[in-house]
From Swiss-Prot:
Keyword field contains Zinc: no
The family this protein is said to belong to: Belongs to the bacterial ribosomal protein bL32 family.
Protein's recorded name: Large ribosomal subunit protein bL32
Organism: Mycobacterium marinum (strain ATCC BAA-535 / M)
GO cellular component: large ribosomal subunit
GO biological process: translation
HAMAP family: Ribosomal_bL32
Length: 57
């Protein structure tokens, strides 16, 4: 694992960390048993197969 040669200041550490941003999951419409739901794209197949309870929120 890489280790730093010199100590990084608190300001530099925080400005580096602030560049990492969480992105919002894109919701895709899916119709299951005649009802329309919006789910994240990565859960689309599981929603169609009935592995996810879409009525519970």
């Amino acid at each position: 694992m890489a280790t730093p040669k010199r100590r990084m200041s608190r300001a530099n550490t925080r400005s580096r960390r602030s560049q990492w941003k969480a992105t919002k999951a894109e919701l895709v419409g899916v119709t299951v048993a005649g009802q329309k739901h919006k789910v994240p794209r990565r859960l689309l197949k599981a929603a169609r197969l009935g592995l996810i309870d879409l009525d519970r929120r």
